[in-house]
A protein has these predicted regions:
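Cysteine-centered catalytic environments shared across enzyme families
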Residues: 1-264, 556
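Exposed alpha-helical structural elements
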Residues: 53-56, 103-105, 121-122, 177-184, ...
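Short alpha-helical segments and helix-capping/turn motifs at coil-helix boundaries
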Residues: 53-55, 63-65, 134-138, 288-298, ...
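Structural motif
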Residues: 115-123, 362-373, 419, 509-525, ...
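Short coil/turn segments at secondary-structure boundaries
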Residues: 136-143, 392, 422-425, 439-444, ...
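Core structural elements
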Residues: 150, 372-387
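ATP-dependent adenylate-handling active sites, centered on carboxylate activation for C-N bond formation
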Residues: 155, 167-368, 383-437, 449, ...
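PAPS-dependent sulfotransferase catalytic core
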Residues: 434-515
Length: 556
Protein backbone atom coordinates (compact mmCIF):
# COMPACT_ATOMS: atom_id res chain seq x y z
CA UNK A 1 0.00 0.00 0.00
CA UNK A 2 1.23 3.58 -0.51
CA UNK A 3 3.40 4.72 2.40
CA UNK A 4 1.43 7.95 2.75
CA UNK A 5 -1.67 6.04 3.95
CA UNK A 6 0.23 4.34 6.79
CA UNK A 7 0.44 5.96 10.20
CA UNK A 8 2.15 4.68 13.31
CA UNK A 9 2.79 5.04 17.02
CA UNK A 10 5.55 3.73 19.22
CA UNK A 11 6.40 3.35 22.88
CA UNK A 12 9.77 2.75 24.50
CA UNK A 13 10.42 1.51 28.01
CA UNK A 14 13.23 -0.21 29.89
CA UNK A 15 14.48 -2.92 27.55
CA UNK A 16 11.23 -2.94 25.54
CA UNK A 17 9.92 -1.12 22.47
CA UNK A 18 6.46 -1.46 20.95
CA UNK A 19 5.76 -0.27 17.40
CA UNK A 20 2.33 -0.15 15.75
CA UNK A 21 1.26 0.78 12.23
CA UNK A 22 -2.11 0.91 10.47
CA UNK A 23 -3.70 2.14 7.27
CA UNK A 24 -6.91 3.06 9.10
CA UNK A 25 -7.15 6.83 8.58
CA UNK A 26 -7.81 7.66 12.24
CA UNK A 27 -8.72 6.19 15.63
CA UNK A 28 -12.48 6.52 15.16
CA UNK A 29 -12.58 2.74 15.12
CA UNK A 30 -11.86 1.87 18.74
CA UNK A 31 -9.69 0.98 20.51
CA UNK A 32 -6.92 3.31 19.31
CA UNK A 33 -3.65 2.05 17.87
CA UNK A 34 -2.04 1.95 21.33
CA UNK A 35 -3.93 2.12 24.63
CA UNK A 36 -2.39 2.99 28.01
CA UNK A 37 -4.07 1.38 31.02
CA UNK A 38 -2.86 0.61 34.53
CA UNK A 39 0.80 1.06 33.62
CA UNK A 40 0.53 -1.11 30.51
CA UNK A 41 0.70 -0.18 26.83
CA UNK A 42 -1.74 -2.35 24.84
CA UNK A 43 -1.71 -2.84 21.09
CA UNK A 44 -4.36 -4.72 19.15
CA UNK A 45 -4.13 -6.42 15.77
CA UNK A 46 -7.69 -6.94 14.51
CA UNK A 47 -10.82 -5.89 16.36
CA UNK A 48 -12.76 -6.52 19.57
CA UNK A 49 -16.51 -7.09 19.72
CA UNK A 50 -16.52 -4.68 22.67
CA UNK A 51 -13.66 -2.15 22.43
CA UNK A 52 -13.80 -1.68 26.22
CA UNK A 53 -12.41 -5.22 26.56
CA UNK A 54 -8.99 -3.90 25.53
CA UNK A 55 -8.18 -3.25 29.19
CA UNK A 56 -8.87 -6.94 30.03
CA UNK A 57 -6.40 -8.35 27.52
CA UNK A 58 -5.05 -10.96 27.36
CA UNK A 59 -8.34 -12.72 28.10
CA UNK A 60 -9.57 -15.96 26.52
CA UNK A 61 -13.18 -14.87 26.98
CA UNK A 62 -12.92 -11.64 24.98
CA UNK A 63 -14.96 -11.49 21.80
CA UNK A 64 -13.53 -10.44 18.46
CA UNK A 65 -10.89 -11.40 15.95
CA UNK A 66 -7.53 -10.26 17.29
CA UNK A 67 -4.07 -10.74 18.68
CA UNK A 68 -2.87 -8.63 21.61
CA UNK A 69 0.47 -6.98 22.42
CA UNK A 70 1.20 -5.62 25.90
CA UNK A 71 4.32 -3.78 27.04
CA UNK A 72 5.68 -2.23 30.19
CA UNK A 73 9.16 -1.63 31.56
CA UNK A 74 11.15 -4.86 31.25
CA UNK A 75 8.20 -6.88 29.93
CA UNK A 76 6.51 -7.68 26.63
CA UNK A 77 3.73 -10.16 25.88
CA UNK A 78 1.99 -11.20 22.67
CA UNK A 79 -1.03 -13.49 22.58
CA UNK A 80 -3.25 -15.18 20.01
CA UNK A 81 -6.96 -15.87 20.05
CA UNK A 82 -8.37 -19.36 19.62
CA UNK A 83 -7.87 -19.59 15.85
CA UNK A 84 -4.75 -17.35 15.53
CA UNK A 85 -6.19 -15.83 12.36
CA UNK A 86 -4.55 -12.61 13.54
CA UNK A 87 -1.09 -14.13 13.81
CA UNK A 88 1.89 -13.62 16.09
CA UNK A 89 5.34 -14.49 14.74
CA UNK A 90 8.38 -14.62 16.99
CA UNK A 91 12.14 -15.08 16.88
CA UNK A 92 14.93 -15.17 19.44
CA UNK A 93 18.62 -14.26 19.23
CA UNK A 94 21.29 -14.18 21.97
CA UNK A 95 20.59 -10.46 22.39
CA UNK A 96 17.02 -9.92 21.31
CA UNK A 97 13.44 -11.22 21.41
CA UNK A 98 11.26 -10.11 18.51
CA UNK A 99 7.51 -10.63 18.06
CA UNK A 100 5.30 -9.17 15.37
CA UNK A 101 2.33 -9.69 13.09
CA UNK A 102 4.50 -9.91 9.93
CA UNK A 103 6.91 -12.85 9.67
CA UNK A 104 9.44 -11.26 7.30
CA UNK A 105 9.63 -8.12 9.43
CA UNK A 106 10.32 -10.26 12.51
CA UNK A 107 13.03 -12.15 10.59
CA UNK A 108 14.77 -8.99 9.40
CA UNK A 109 14.49 -7.26 12.78
CA UNK A 110 16.20 -10.24 14.43
CA UNK A 111 19.15 -10.23 12.00
CA UNK A 112 22.36 -8.22 12.07
CA UNK A 113 22.16 -7.76 8.28
CA UNK A 114 19.41 -7.38 5.70
CA UNK A 115 19.87 -10.81 4.13
CA UNK A 116 16.86 -13.14 4.04
CA UNK A 117 17.59 -16.73 5.09
CA UNK A 118 14.92 -19.27 4.22
CA UNK A 119 13.92 -22.42 6.07
CA UNK A 120 13.83 -24.66 3.00
CA UNK A 121 12.70 -27.84 4.76
CA UNK A 122 9.72 -26.00 6.25
CA UNK A 123 8.60 -25.11 2.72
CA UNK A 124 7.79 -28.74 1.87
CA UNK A 125 4.28 -28.17 3.19
CA UNK A 126 3.89 -25.09 0.97
CA UNK A 127 4.66 -27.22 -2.08
CA UNK A 128 2.19 -29.93 -1.00
CA UNK A 129 -0.76 -27.78 0.03
CA UNK A 130 -0.04 -24.15 -0.83
CA UNK A 131 -0.01 -23.13 2.85
CA UNK A 132 1.66 -24.17 6.12
CA UNK A 133 0.60 -27.27 8.05
CA UNK A 134 2.95 -26.41 10.89
CA UNK A 135 4.05 -23.53 13.11
CA UNK A 136 6.99 -22.92 10.78
CA UNK A 137 7.44 -20.01 8.39
CA UNK A 138 9.56 -19.55 5.26
CA UNK A 139 12.12 -17.67 7.36
CA UNK A 140 14.87 -19.26 9.40
CA UNK A 141 14.29 -18.90 13.12
CA UNK A 142 10.77 -17.45 12.87
CA UNK A 143 7.78 -19.41 14.20
CA UNK A 144 4.04 -18.78 14.41
CA UNK A 145 2.59 -18.71 17.91
CA UNK A 146 0.01 -21.45 18.42
CA UNK A 147 -3.72 -20.87 18.99
CA UNK A 148 -4.73 -19.52 22.42
CA UNK A 149 -1.11 -18.98 23.38
CA UNK A 150 0.83 -16.25 25.13
CA UNK A 151 4.47 -15.36 24.64
CA UNK A 152 5.93 -13.47 27.62
CA UNK A 153 9.38 -11.89 27.74
CA UNK A 154 10.29 -10.60 31.19
CA UNK A 155 13.74 -9.15 31.83
CA UNK A 156 15.16 -11.02 28.84
CA UNK A 157 13.68 -14.47 29.60
CA UNK A 158 10.99 -15.90 27.33
CA UNK A 159 8.16 -18.26 28.26
CA UNK A 160 5.25 -19.52 26.13
CA UNK A 161 2.01 -20.80 27.64
CA UNK A 162 -0.76 -22.48 25.67
CA UNK A 163 -4.43 -23.14 26.44
CA UNK A 164 -5.68 -26.31 24.70
CA UNK A 165 -8.66 -26.03 22.38
CA UNK A 166 -11.94 -26.92 24.11
CA UNK A 167 -12.90 -30.56 24.27
CA UNK A 168 -16.34 -31.12 22.80
CA UNK A 169 -19.11 -32.25 25.12
CA UNK A 170 -21.06 -35.39 24.16
CA UNK A 171 -24.01 -34.83 21.87
CA UNK A 172 -27.06 -33.80 23.95
CA UNK A 173 -29.59 -36.58 24.32
CA UNK A 174 -32.73 -34.50 24.80
CA UNK A 175 -34.38 -31.68 22.88
CA UNK A 176 -34.07 -29.39 25.91
CA UNK A 177 -30.34 -29.92 26.20
CA UNK A 178 -29.89 -29.45 22.46
CA UNK A 179 -31.71 -26.11 22.67
CA UNK A 180 -29.50 -25.04 25.57
CA UNK A 181 -26.28 -25.97 23.78
CA UNK A 182 -27.29 -24.22 20.57
CA UNK A 183 -28.44 -21.27 22.68
CA UNK A 184 -24.90 -20.74 23.95
CA UNK A 185 -23.61 -20.65 20.37
CA UNK A 186 -26.42 -18.27 19.37
CA UNK A 187 -25.58 -15.94 22.26
CA UNK A 188 -21.91 -15.85 21.23
CA UNK A 189 -22.88 -15.04 17.64
CA UNK A 190 -25.32 -12.32 18.69
CA UNK A 191 -22.64 -10.67 20.82
CA UNK A 192 -20.39 -10.32 17.76
CA UNK A 193 -22.90 -8.27 15.76
CA UNK A 194 -24.82 -6.31 18.41
CA UNK A 195 -22.27 -3.42 18.31
CA UNK A 196 -23.15 -2.98 14.61
CA UNK A 197 -26.61 -1.62 15.49
CA UNK A 198 -25.30 1.87 16.12
CA UNK A 199 -23.01 2.31 13.11
CA UNK A 200 -25.38 4.64 11.29
CA UNK A 201 -25.31 2.63 8.06
CA UNK A 202 -26.43 -0.88 7.14
CA UNK A 203 -24.07 -3.84 6.97
CA UNK A 204 -23.59 -5.21 3.45
CA UNK A 205 -23.88 -9.01 3.52
CA UNK A 206 -22.74 -11.06 0.54
CA UNK A 207 -25.61 -13.58 0.48
CA UNK A 208 -25.72 -16.85 -1.44
CA UNK A 209 -28.12 -19.76 -1.45
CA UNK A 210 -25.87 -21.79 0.82
CA UNK A 211 -25.68 -22.49 4.52
CA UNK A 212 -23.13 -20.14 6.03
CA UNK A 213 -24.37 -16.79 4.73
CA UNK A 214 -27.93 -17.82 5.66
CA UNK A 215 -26.77 -18.13 9.27
CA UNK A 216 -25.44 -14.57 9.03
CA UNK A 217 -28.65 -13.19 7.51
CA UNK A 218 -30.64 -14.83 10.30
CA UNK A 219 -28.13 -13.52 12.85
CA UNK A 220 -28.32 -9.89 11.69
CA UNK A 221 -32.11 -10.15 11.60
CA UNK A 222 -32.30 -11.53 15.15
CA UNK A 223 -29.89 -8.88 16.46
CA UNK A 224 -31.93 -6.10 14.79
CA UNK A 225 -28.87 -4.88 12.93
CA UNK A 226 -29.75 -2.89 9.79
CA UNK A 227 -28.38 -4.72 6.76
CA UNK A 228 -28.76 -5.18 3.04
CA UNK A 229 -27.70 -8.12 0.90
CA UNK A 230 -25.83 -8.49 -2.37
CA UNK A 231 -25.68 -11.57 -4.60
CA UNK A 232 -23.53 -12.17 -7.65
CA UNK A 233 -25.07 -14.13 -10.53
CA UNK A 234 -27.76 -14.32 -13.17
CA UNK A 235 -31.44 -14.26 -12.23
CA UNK A 236 -31.67 -17.97 -13.05
CA UNK A 237 -28.85 -18.99 -10.70
CA UNK A 238 -29.87 -20.79 -7.46
CA UNK A 239 -27.85 -18.29 -5.40
CA UNK A 240 -29.91 -15.41 -6.76
CA UNK A 241 -33.24 -17.24 -6.60
CA UNK A 242 -32.77 -18.28 -2.98
CA UNK A 243 -31.18 -15.02 -1.80
CA UNK A 244 -34.13 -13.11 -3.25
CA UNK A 245 -36.52 -15.24 -1.18
CA UNK A 246 -34.44 -14.77 1.99
CA UNK A 247 -34.29 -10.99 1.49
CA UNK A 248 -38.06 -10.82 0.96
CA UNK A 249 -38.79 -12.92 4.06
CA UNK A 250 -36.52 -10.75 6.21
CA UNK A 251 -37.61 -7.48 4.61
CA UNK A 252 -34.19 -6.25 3.50
CA UNK A 253 -32.89 -4.65 0.33
CA UNK A 254 -31.41 -7.11 -2.18
CA UNK A 255 -29.03 -6.17 -4.99
CA UNK A 256 -28.11 -8.62 -7.73
CA UNK A 257 -24.83 -8.06 -9.54
CA UNK A 258 -25.02 -9.87 -12.85
CA UNK A 259 -21.77 -10.99 -14.47
CA UNK A 260 -20.80 -9.18 -17.68
CA UNK A 261 -22.57 -10.75 -20.64
CA UNK A 262 -19.93 -11.14 -23.30
CA UNK A 263 -19.46 -13.43 -26.23
CA UNK A 264 -17.95 -16.78 -25.37
CA UNK A 265 -14.17 -16.55 -25.42
CA UNK A 266 -11.82 -19.21 -26.64
CA UNK A 267 -8.90 -17.54 -24.82
CA UNK A 268 -8.19 -15.00 -22.08
CA UNK A 269 -5.29 -12.68 -21.36
CA UNK A 270 -3.92 -13.15 -17.84
CA UNK A 271 -1.27 -11.53 -15.69
CA UNK A 272 2.28 -12.82 -16.12
CA UNK A 273 2.87 -15.42 -13.37
CA UNK A 274 5.99 -13.59 -12.16
CA UNK A 275 3.93 -10.46 -11.45
CA UNK A 276 1.28 -12.58 -9.74
CA UNK A 277 3.90 -14.35 -7.62
CA UNK A 278 5.59 -11.08 -6.64
CA UNK A 279 2.32 -9.61 -5.35
CA UNK A 280 1.46 -12.82 -3.49
CA UNK A 281 4.91 -13.01 -1.87
CA UNK A 282 4.75 -9.35 -0.89
CA UNK A 283 1.27 -9.60 0.58
CA UNK A 284 1.34 -13.10 2.10
CA UNK A 285 5.10 -13.43 2.81
CA UNK A 286 5.54 -16.81 1.16
CA UNK A 287 2.81 -18.48 3.21
CA UNK A 288 0.15 -18.62 0.47
CA UNK A 289 0.52 -20.00 -3.05
CA UNK A 290 0.21 -17.77 -6.11
CA UNK A 291 -2.43 -20.28 -7.22
CA UNK A 292 -4.75 -18.34 -4.90
CA UNK A 293 -6.22 -15.04 -6.04
CA UNK A 294 -5.24 -12.44 -3.46
CA UNK A 295 -7.44 -9.37 -3.07
CA UNK A 296 -5.62 -6.37 -4.51
CA UNK A 297 -5.08 -3.06 -2.74
CA UNK A 298 -7.75 -0.37 -2.58
CA UNK A 299 -7.93 2.60 -0.18
CA UNK A 300 -9.18 1.64 3.27
CA UNK A 301 -12.93 1.72 3.77
CA UNK A 302 -14.70 1.63 7.11
CA UNK A 303 -17.99 0.49 5.58
CA UNK A 304 -19.23 -2.65 7.39
CA UNK A 305 -19.19 -5.77 5.22
CA UNK A 306 -19.76 -9.43 5.99
CA UNK A 307 -19.45 -12.79 4.24
CA UNK A 308 -19.64 -16.46 5.18
CA UNK A 309 -15.89 -17.04 5.40
CA UNK A 310 -14.97 -19.81 7.86
CA UNK A 311 -18.54 -20.96 8.35
CA UNK A 312 -17.21 -24.52 8.24
CA UNK A 313 -16.21 -23.95 11.89
CA UNK A 314 -19.86 -24.46 12.83
CA UNK A 315 -19.90 -27.70 10.79
CA UNK A 316 -16.78 -29.44 12.23
CA UNK A 317 -14.33 -27.99 9.69
CA UNK A 318 -13.73 -28.44 5.98
CA UNK A 319 -11.56 -31.56 6.41
CA UNK A 320 -14.42 -33.47 8.05
CA UNK A 321 -16.88 -32.09 5.50
CA UNK A 322 -14.82 -33.70 2.73
CA UNK A 323 -15.46 -37.14 4.20
CA UNK A 324 -18.18 -39.52 3.09
CA UNK A 325 -16.68 -42.40 5.08
CA UNK A 326 -16.42 -41.55 8.79
CA UNK A 327 -14.79 -44.83 9.77
CA UNK A 328 -11.55 -44.74 11.75
CA UNK A 329 -9.38 -45.93 8.85
CA UNK A 330 -10.81 -43.38 6.44
CA UNK A 331 -10.38 -40.51 8.89
CA UNK A 332 -6.82 -41.58 9.68
CA UNK A 333 -6.10 -41.70 5.96
CA UNK A 334 -7.41 -38.13 5.62
CA UNK A 335 -4.90 -36.96 8.24
CA UNK A 336 -2.07 -38.88 6.55
CA UNK A 337 -2.82 -37.53 3.09
CA UNK A 338 -3.28 -33.99 4.38
CA UNK A 339 0.31 -34.00 5.63
CA UNK A 340 1.85 -36.45 3.14
CA UNK A 341 0.24 -35.51 -0.17
CA UNK A 342 2.21 -36.29 -3.38
CA UNK A 343 4.88 -38.19 -1.45
CA UNK A 344 6.67 -39.39 -4.63
CA UNK A 345 7.54 -35.81 -5.52
CA UNK A 346 9.47 -35.22 -2.29
CA UNK A 347 12.82 -36.22 -0.88
CA UNK A 348 13.07 -38.72 1.95
CA UNK A 349 13.99 -35.90 4.34
CA UNK A 350 10.93 -33.86 3.33
CA UNK A 351 8.62 -36.86 3.73
CA UNK A 352 10.13 -37.69 7.13
CA UNK A 353 9.54 -34.10 8.19
CA UNK A 354 5.91 -34.30 7.04
CA UNK A 355 5.43 -37.54 8.98
CA UNK A 356 6.88 -35.90 12.08
CA UNK A 357 4.38 -33.04 11.76
CA UNK A 358 1.52 -35.52 11.32
CA UNK A 359 2.52 -37.73 14.26
CA UNK A 360 0.80 -35.84 17.12
CA UNK A 361 -2.41 -35.60 15.09
CA UNK A 362 -2.36 -39.29 14.21
CA UNK A 363 -1.84 -40.09 17.90
CA UNK A 364 -5.24 -38.61 18.75
CA UNK A 365 -7.83 -41.31 19.24
CA UNK A 366 -10.77 -39.05 18.37
CA UNK A 367 -10.30 -38.63 14.61
CA UNK A 368 -13.23 -36.26 14.13
CA UNK A 369 -11.82 -33.98 16.80
CA UNK A 370 -8.34 -34.19 15.26
CA UNK A 371 -9.62 -33.08 11.84
CA UNK A 372 -11.80 -30.42 13.44
CA UNK A 373 -8.82 -28.97 15.28
CA UNK A 374 -6.55 -29.32 12.23
CA UNK A 375 -8.96 -27.05 10.39
CA UNK A 376 -8.72 -24.42 13.14
CA UNK A 377 -4.95 -24.69 13.59
CA UNK A 378 -3.93 -24.66 9.96
CA UNK A 379 -6.73 -24.00 7.45
CA UNK A 380 -7.90 -20.99 9.45
CA UNK A 381 -4.83 -20.22 11.54
CA UNK A 382 -2.28 -20.40 8.72
CA UNK A 383 -4.00 -20.39 5.30
CA UNK A 384 -6.73 -17.82 6.01
CA UNK A 385 -4.47 -15.83 8.31
CA UNK A 386 -2.07 -15.38 5.40
CA UNK A 387 -4.49 -15.10 2.47
CA UNK A 388 -6.72 -12.48 4.13
CA UNK A 389 -3.78 -10.05 4.34
CA UNK A 390 -4.80 -8.78 0.91
CA UNK A 391 -8.38 -7.93 1.84
CA UNK A 392 -7.33 -6.35 5.15
CA UNK A 393 -5.63 -3.58 3.18
CA UNK A 394 -9.11 -2.52 2.03
CA UNK A 395 -10.80 -2.70 5.43
CA UNK A 396 -11.53 -5.05 8.30
CA UNK A 397 -14.75 -6.96 7.53
CA UNK A 398 -16.84 -8.31 10.37
CA UNK A 399 -16.29 -12.09 10.53
CA UNK A 400 -18.63 -13.66 13.12
CA UNK A 401 -17.34 -17.16 12.34
CA UNK A 402 -13.80 -16.06 13.25
CA UNK A 403 -14.85 -14.50 16.56
CA UNK A 404 -12.95 -15.84 19.57
CA UNK A 405 -16.08 -16.61 21.61
CA UNK A 406 -17.97 -18.09 18.66
CA UNK A 407 -15.15 -20.50 17.79
CA UNK A 408 -14.84 -21.52 21.44
CA UNK A 409 -18.59 -22.18 21.67
CA UNK A 410 -18.60 -24.14 18.40
CA UNK A 411 -15.65 -26.34 19.35
CA UNK A 412 -17.42 -27.21 22.59
CA UNK A 413 -20.19 -28.95 20.62
CA UNK A 414 -19.87 -32.58 19.56
CA UNK A 415 -18.16 -32.90 16.17
CA UNK A 416 -20.54 -35.49 14.73
CA UNK A 417 -23.50 -33.33 15.73
CA UNK A 418 -22.03 -30.25 14.05
CA UNK A 419 -21.05 -32.32 11.01
CA UNK A 420 -24.67 -33.47 10.63
CA UNK A 421 -25.62 -29.79 10.07
CA UNK A 422 -28.47 -30.11 12.56
CA UNK A 423 -26.75 -27.43 14.67
CA UNK A 424 -26.74 -24.73 12.00
CA UNK A 425 -30.19 -25.72 10.71
CA UNK A 426 -31.63 -25.33 14.21
CA UNK A 427 -29.61 -22.16 14.72
CA UNK A 428 -31.13 -20.56 11.61
CA UNK A 429 -34.66 -21.42 12.75
CA UNK A 430 -33.94 -20.07 16.23
CA UNK A 431 -32.68 -16.75 14.84
CA UNK A 432 -35.11 -16.36 11.93
CA UNK A 433 -38.10 -18.74 11.97
CA UNK A 434 -39.34 -17.09 8.76
CA UNK A 435 -36.65 -18.99 6.85
CA UNK A 436 -37.97 -22.43 7.83
CA UNK A 437 -39.12 -23.51 4.37
CA UNK A 438 -36.59 -21.65 2.19
CA UNK A 439 -34.72 -24.10 -0.08
CA UNK A 440 -30.98 -24.65 0.32
CA UNK A 441 -28.51 -24.54 -2.58
CA UNK A 442 -26.41 -27.62 -3.27
CA UNK A 443 -26.80 -30.88 -1.40
CA UNK A 444 -29.63 -31.57 1.09
CA UNK A 445 -29.06 -30.98 4.77
CA UNK A 446 -26.79 -33.79 5.95
CA UNK A 447 -28.90 -34.85 8.91
CA UNK A 448 -31.97 -35.03 6.66
CA UNK A 449 -30.28 -37.10 3.97
CA UNK A 450 -28.50 -39.47 6.33
CA UNK A 451 -30.60 -39.84 9.45
CA UNK A 452 -34.10 -38.45 9.29
CA UNK A 453 -37.06 -40.72 8.55
CA UNK A 454 -38.93 -40.10 5.33
CA UNK A 455 -41.84 -38.43 7.13
CA UNK A 456 -39.50 -35.87 8.74
CA UNK A 457 -37.61 -35.27 5.48
CA UNK A 458 -40.86 -34.19 3.85
CA UNK A 459 -41.13 -31.37 6.40
CA UNK A 460 -37.74 -29.94 5.39
CA UNK A 461 -37.29 -27.40 2.58
CA UNK A 462 -36.17 -28.66 -0.80
CA UNK A 463 -32.64 -28.15 -2.05
CA UNK A 464 -31.66 -26.66 -5.40
CA UNK A 465 -28.71 -28.41 -7.07
CA UNK A 466 -25.61 -26.32 -7.58
CA UNK A 467 -25.77 -24.71 -11.00
CA UNK A 468 -23.26 -25.84 -13.57
CA UNK A 469 -22.19 -23.01 -15.81
CA UNK A 470 -22.26 -24.27 -19.37
CA UNK A 471 -18.83 -24.20 -20.89
CA UNK A 472 -17.28 -22.74 -17.75
CA UNK A 473 -13.53 -23.04 -17.39
CA UNK A 474 -10.74 -21.45 -15.38
CA UNK A 475 -7.31 -20.51 -16.66
CA UNK A 476 -5.84 -21.52 -13.29
CA UNK A 477 -7.07 -25.11 -13.55
CA UNK A 478 -6.60 -25.28 -17.34
CA UNK A 479 -3.41 -23.25 -17.79
CA UNK A 480 -2.74 -24.14 -21.42
CA UNK A 481 0.69 -24.56 -23.04
CA UNK A 482 1.88 -20.92 -22.94
CA UNK A 483 1.35 -20.50 -19.20
CA UNK A 484 2.64 -24.02 -18.54
CA UNK A 485 5.85 -23.09 -20.38
CA UNK A 486 6.45 -20.15 -18.03
CA UNK A 487 5.72 -22.20 -14.92
CA UNK A 488 7.97 -25.00 -16.20
CA UNK A 489 10.87 -22.69 -17.13
CA UNK A 490 10.94 -21.06 -13.69
CA UNK A 491 10.66 -24.30 -11.71
CA UNK A 492 13.07 -26.40 -13.77
CA UNK A 493 15.45 -23.48 -14.07
CA UNK A 494 15.74 -23.24 -10.29
CA UNK A 495 15.73 -26.93 -9.34
CA UNK A 496 18.97 -26.51 -7.39
CA UNK A 497 17.11 -24.32 -4.90
CA UNK A 498 14.31 -26.88 -4.59
CA UNK A 499 16.32 -30.13 -4.43
CA UNK A 500 16.53 -30.21 -0.61
CA UNK A 501 12.79 -30.96 -0.60
CA UNK A 502 11.82 -32.36 -4.05
CA UNK A 503 13.07 -35.07 -6.40
CA UNK A 504 14.22 -33.40 -9.65
CA UNK A 505 13.16 -36.32 -11.86
CA UNK A 506 9.63 -36.26 -10.43
CA UNK A 507 9.41 -32.51 -10.96
CA UNK A 508 10.51 -32.91 -14.58
CA UNK A 509 7.90 -35.63 -15.03
CA UNK A 510 5.23 -33.30 -13.62
CA UNK A 511 6.00 -30.79 -16.37
CA UNK A 512 6.63 -33.33 -19.16
CA UNK A 513 3.33 -32.78 -20.97
CA UNK A 514 2.61 -29.60 -22.97
CA UNK A 515 -0.03 -28.69 -20.37
CA UNK A 516 0.71 -29.51 -16.73
CA UNK A 517 -1.78 -32.05 -15.34
CA UNK A 518 -1.63 -30.79 -11.73
CA UNK A 519 -1.84 -27.00 -12.06
CA UNK A 520 -2.25 -26.28 -8.33
CA UNK A 521 0.91 -28.25 -7.54
CA UNK A 522 2.72 -26.48 -10.38
CA UNK A 523 1.73 -23.10 -8.95
CA UNK A 524 2.86 -24.13 -5.45
CA UNK A 525 6.26 -25.14 -6.86
CA UNK A 526 6.43 -21.92 -8.83
CA UNK A 527 5.68 -19.83 -5.74
CA UNK A 528 8.34 -21.54 -3.62
CA UNK A 529 10.82 -21.37 -6.50
CA UNK A 530 10.39 -17.60 -6.88
CA UNK A 531 10.64 -17.15 -3.11
CA UNK A 532 13.91 -19.10 -2.87
CA UNK A 533 15.45 -17.34 -5.87
CA UNK A 534 14.83 -13.88 -4.42
CA UNK A 535 11.85 -12.48 -6.31
CA UNK A 536 10.73 -10.80 -3.09
CA UNK A 537 11.89 -8.80 -1.25
CA UNK A 538 12.91 -7.09 -4.46
CA UNK A 539 11.73 -4.63 -7.05
CA UNK A 540 8.36 -5.27 -8.65
CA UNK A 541 8.76 -6.86 -12.10
CA UNK A 542 8.07 -4.39 -14.89
CA UNK A 543 7.26 -4.68 -18.57
CA UNK A 544 6.11 -8.30 -18.43
CA UNK A 545 3.60 -9.25 -21.14
CA UNK A 546 0.18 -10.65 -20.41
CA UNK A 547 -0.21 -14.32 -21.28
CA UNK A 548 -2.79 -15.85 -23.59
CA UNK A 549 -4.44 -18.92 -22.09
CA UNK A 550 -6.58 -20.85 -24.53
CA UNK A 551 -9.69 -22.76 -23.62
CA UNK A 552 -8.98 -26.52 -23.61
CA UNK A 553 -11.78 -27.31 -26.06
CA UNK A 554 -13.20 -24.23 -27.81
CA UNK A 555 -15.93 -26.31 -29.45
CA UNK A 556 -17.35 -27.39 -26.09
Amino acid sequence: MPPEVVRGREWHGRGVSLFAWTNEPDDSRQPPLLTEHDGRIIGLNGHLADPADVTRLPDDSAGGCFSAWIARDGELSASTAINRVCPVFHAETPDLHVAGSRALLVHLAARDDDRVEHDVLALQTMVRQGFFLSDETPYKGVSALRPSSRLLVRDGARTITETPLPQAAPMPTSARRKRAAIGELADALLATVEPLRDLGEPVNLALTGGRDTRVLAALLHAARVPFRVTTNGLDTHPDVIIARVIAARLGVEHTVIAPPQTAAKDAVLVEHPLSRAWETLRTCEGMTSAYETIVSYLPYSGKPTMSGQSGETLRAGSLNLLQTDLGDKALRRRIETTFGKDAKLFTAEANEHAQELARPWLARTDRLEALDHLYIWYKVGRWQASARAGSLRRGDPVRPFLDNRVVRAALSLDQSWRLSEEVIYTLILRLAPKLRDVPIEGKPWRFAANQAPALFRRRLPEHLPTARTAGGWSWRTSPGPALTDLLRDQVLGSLDALTPIVNPDEVRALFAAPVVAKPALAWHLYTVSTLLTGLYPGKQPEGLPRITVSRPDPAR
